[in-house]
Amino acid sequence: MTSENHTTIKADSALVMSPTGSTSQAAPFSPSTSKPIQELPDELIQAGWSKCWSKRENRPYYFNRFTNQSLWEMPVLGQHDVISDPLGLNAAPASGEANADAGLGNGQRKRHPSEDASQAGPNSFKRPKVEIPATPTTPTVPISPSTPGVKPWVNTTTDEKQGQASTPAPAPYRPSVVYWDLDIQTNAVIRERAPADHLPPHPEIELQRAQLTTKLRQHYHELCSQREGIEPPRESFNRWLLERKVVDKGLDPLLPSECDPVISPSMFREIMNDIPIRLSRIKYKEEARKLLFKYAEAAKKMIDSRNATPESRKVVKWNVEDTMNWLRRDHSASKEDYMDRLEHLRKQCGPHVASVAKDSVEGICSKIYHISAEYVRRIRQAHLTLLKECNISVDGTESAEVQDRLVYCYPVRLSIPAPPQTRVELHFENDIACLRFKGEMVKVSRGHFNKLELLYRYSCIDDPRFEKFLSRVWCLIKRYQVMFGSGVNEGSGLQGSLPVPVFEALNKQFGVTFECFASPLNCYFKQFCSAFPDIDGFFGSRGPFLSFSPASGSFEANPPFCEELMDAMVTHFEDLLGRSSEPLSFIIFVPEWRDPPTPALTRMEASRFRRHQMTVPAFEHEYRSGSQHICKREEIYYKAIHGTAVIFLQNNAGFAKWEPTTERIQELLAAYKVSGRSLPSPGPSSTNTGEKDSKPAPERTAPSQDNSSPVDKTAQDTTNT
């Protein structure tokens, strides 16, 4: 039980806010803390038991500080220790009935095998049934913690359990390093909203989506190779997915299908930047000479093989010939001379080369989009068929009544009930949890698997017995794996996040409790926005940030480094700040790109809501890798090779409440100086368990007037330097 405060006084407050629109007058209602607390017998106190009061449930519960066990009913004297004596062989029951129920948690009725067989699904976590009302005002936190010693992720049948009865239950897994703090409650307030109409996730559909997305990546690779003779720009497909989702009105959570315009500016720009060849970073003089020669040769070949105007052919051929002559006669040139000559050649030939490649590149973008739309149609049809076979109607779903009131933010709820889930197998390989469905395996560290279990217990309201937990974890990991690709370190920058000490400083100094761009895998707080509401909502997501409209709260934003997404983010910030009179604050972390500056950075610097701005120098701070849920511990932190601009956007009330004073800024900068790789155990020390804001890729989509690759501008940020 890692997120409960075991005290007779401290507890959680209710979620309901007064609909008056004022957070100062709308303090959440909470029951009195002056409830008389019944004294426990000395025997129970000596055994580690104490009686605590739950404000959430408005009733007492009992907590054992030695075993971390929590019970609603008073512990029975002589009850056995479920950890040291899981079978109750040494117990001293008070009655025959108690003896018959030995091995069960206190207050739990022994279940018959027939009941277990009928109620336990293929992905069942054997947990005591917990009733959680599905109202948005109910705190999305577990009513009762799991019983120590019980491993809910063990998928076994009743017969298997009986055959293994002689094996003691293993001790609960406790990660040695924690990169999150799930105890922090939100201060983000929103208007109550109806459940979303997304189709509920299912492993069969997720597997089909993964296969078609991989096939789409292959189509993209083939088109770039066949039509332009280049490799697809690194991460360009990933940024295409991000950019398309800014404008997409389609129904699939991952693939775009209804976008205007059809031609993606992001994909078009990145392919054009690698034509006629991809320019790489140069360290030595000979490399610069070879690169200049290759560029001149490729430009001449392209202009000869395409339908170019006579003027374009003349300009390109003359400049290429002039460059070749210079290379033949000048053997004493330095690296800088070669690079200057290359820049001159690009300025002269670039516009003509781009004009002959324009139609072909637009054709690539258009074809990829239309293939994606066809794949979306197939996936949707298969999903609807599956739901129909389970007698689940999509069109007949009644919309829930929503009151016009302010509430603390709560996870996305789905209006369509989930179908029965197919079996997902789980096993552990050292510190790695491996989940397999139809031969497709996904992996996650045991620490992050434990974190997903906690998030699921806090957020999910339709699966109190954890019967769908494993299948939803498989879908979640598979979705992010497919979105960011299977290459080495591919997409990890798009999922990176701030160091733990920085999150701690943001929370302590500026009241930050919410991440605008994160995922269940890399979030620090248990409340965050993410890309996929249909699956992430079960793990605490409040949905995509561009459709999330808080009335008040303090937020951290570290968006994926996609220019179109960052620009849309700034528009959303200014709209929210302009509409709300309640305290509202956004602290934004974006790359310090000045050659040229990104539109998002320029707009934020000129915003009327900008209260403060600072820069953290390159190589003097770190990020956490987006693959932190699976990579080695020593690879989690990496140095940033670019500066990071930190901008405070606040309305008047937010500035008054969370003003970026000199002292607070100094504390934030000091947190950046703490190396994550030197921390013995990052994260809150008070918890035993517990990853974007989505820290996007330390890569930038290069502007159209620059023919260098995005990778060349920023290199690979996932290596420790």
Swiss-Prot record:
Keywords: Methyltransferase, Nucleus, Transferase. Residues 43-77 form the WW domain. CDD domains: WW. Residues 132-148, 675-686 have a biased composition (Low complexity). Its EC number is 2.1.1.62. Substrate binds at R239, R269, E563, W593, R594, D595, P596, P597. Cap-specific adenosine methyltransferase activity is inhibited by zinc. One of its GO terms (molecular function) is RNA polymerase II C-terminal domain binding. GO terms for biological process: methylation; mRNA processing; positive regulation of translation. Changing F561A: Strongly reduced methyltransferase activity. It catalyses: a 5'-end (N(7)-methyl 5'-triphosphoguanosine)-(2'-O-methyladenosine) in mRNA + S-adenosyl-L-methionine = a 5'-end (N(7)-methyl 5'-triphosphoguanosine)-(N(6),2'-O-dimethyladenosine) in mRNA + S-adenosyl-L-homocysteine + H(+). Its main location: nucleus. SUPFAM superfamilies: WW domain (SSF51045). It is found in: Nucleus. Changing R239A: Strongly reduced methyltransferase activity. Changing W593A: Abolished methyltransferase activity. Residues 1-37, 93-170, 675-721 are annotated as: Disordered. Changing N558A: Strongly reduced methyltransferase activity. Changing E563A: Strongly reduced methyltransferase activity. Residues 1-10, 19-36, 702-721 have a biased composition (Polar residues). S-adenosyl-L-methionine binds at N558, P559, P560, F561, F619, E620, H621. Belongs to the CAPAM family. Cap-specific adenosine methyltransferase that catalyzes formation of N(6),2'-O-dimethyladenosine cap (m6A(m)) by methylating the adenosine at the second transcribed position of capped mRNAs. This is mRNA (2'-O-methyladenosine-N(6)-)-methyltransferase.
